[in-house]
Regions:
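Terminal membrane-proximal soluble interaction domains of membrane-associated proteins
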Residues: 2-70
Length: 70
């Protein structure tokens, strides 16, 4: 497939913020094994570590995420 690699994360994937995203930090996709981390950028304000986020854009391995209101 096009642009599919180890870091391919589809839009709509839910993930856990492992670090604060200010605006860049680390996330782990909820559907992937523990220990698989991705760098992501928050689209809006600071996202706290432990928050659930959703991938809104994935482009050349660069992930843009938005916090999911619980």
């Amino acid at each position: 497939g096009e642009g599919v690699g180890l870091s391919a994360v589809p839009v709509g994937t839910r993930a856990l913020a492992l670090t604060d995203l200010r605006p860049v930090g680390k996330i782990r996709c909820l559907n992937q094994a523990a220990g698989v981390e991705h760098e992501a950028r928050s689209e809006g304000p600071l996202v706290r570590a432990g928050a659930t986020v959703v991938v809104v854009q994935a482009d050349m391995g660069r992930l843009l995420v938005r916090e999911v209101s619980t």
